[in-house]
Amino acid sequence: MKLHFTKMHGAGNDFVVLDGIQTPIDFTPEQWAAIADRHFGVGADQLLLVERSTRPDVDFRYRIFNHDGGEVEHCGNGARCFVKFVTDRGLTDKRTVRVEVMNGIATLTMQDDGQVTVDMGAPVFEAARLPFLPEGLPTRTQGDDTQHALQINGRTEWLSTVSMGNPHAVQIVDDTEAFPVLEDGPLIESHAVFPRRVNAGFMQIVDRHSVRLRVYERGAGETLACGTGACAAVVAGIRRGLLDSPVKVATHGGDLTIAWAGDGQPVMMTGPATTVFEGTLDLDALKLTAAH
């Protein structure tokens, strides 16, 4: 069986996008991981599935699968690619669409310059909703932000915890390029205080409207950009009193602009979405079977 796919990226965070409206798809985690494999599959940080919405007030259902095949709650860079995909394929003629994600609704808007703005919703800080188990950890307060300390590779690392629909732990570092992200990232990601694992963000503050960011993503490793990670980092910086909205977030894959008016308000993310190529996936060659 052959399946059409589109390869896209948002600031270097790359995706395989599949139209589950035209061809209903129900892969196992192992099958999703095989497609994402960069040597034996198409290759991607994550895979995006477009489906019909289950709600009358929403345009589409937006599902995200990590490189390891696990389904996750949200992906901001993927959301920008999602709206470009449904627009380019003629699945909608709306400039703004509402999509159903695992834990709520996201609003996506195509701008006249080709950039995409995503209403990421209001950040959540309650530990139980990440989930995060802070009992017994050292704590400190900076501005409106409460941080917790973990011992990682013999260092004390102070983390701000934020959910942007998926869990993030953000720390401020002096130099993102010099910091051992690839060593510390997986230790934070899989630490016992995060029962469902966590995305680990490492932010360098340039000035009050500009930061550099690297993110070690849950189930994907370090990626060139992470939209929800950029949102979480800016929220943490604003709550600490170190940043003012809007903030330019420089990642290895490109720049994102994040705006946030404060607690209880939605985070707005603006950035690029690019179609790289389209192709046909031979499911039999990958030893995959699509369930219809």
Curated annotation (Swiss-Prot):
Gene3D superfamilies: Diaminopimelate Epimerase, Chain A, domain 1. GO terms for cellular component: cytosol. It catalyses: (2S,6S)-2,6-diaminopimelate = meso-2,6-diaminopimelate. Substrate binds at residues 13, 46, 66, 76-77, 166, 199, 217-218, 227-228. Its EC number is 5.1.1.7. The record marks 168, 217 as: Could be important to modulate the pK values of the two catalytic cysteine residues. Keywords: Amino-acid biosynthesis, Cytoplasm, Isomerase, Lysine biosynthesis. InterPro entries: DAP_epimerase_AS, DAP_epimerase_DapF. GO terms for biological process: lysine biosynthetic process via diaminopimelate. It is found in: Cytoplasm. Pathway: Amino-acid biosynthesis; L-lysine biosynthesis via DAP pathway; DL-2,6-diaminopimelate from LL-2,6-diaminopimelate: step 1/1. The active site is at 75 (proton donor), 226 (proton acceptor). It comes from the Bacteria. GO terms for molecular function: diaminopimelate epimerase activity. Belongs to the diaminopimelate epimerase family. Catalyzes the stereoinversion of LL-2,6-diaminopimelate (L,L-DAP) to meso-diaminopimelate (meso-DAP), a precursor of L-lysine and an essential component of the bacterial peptidoglycan. Homodimer. PANTHER family: DIAMINOPIMELATE EPIMERASE (PTHR31689:SF0), DIAMINOPIMELATE EPIMERASE, CHLOROPLASTIC (PTHR31689). This is Diaminopimelate epimerase.
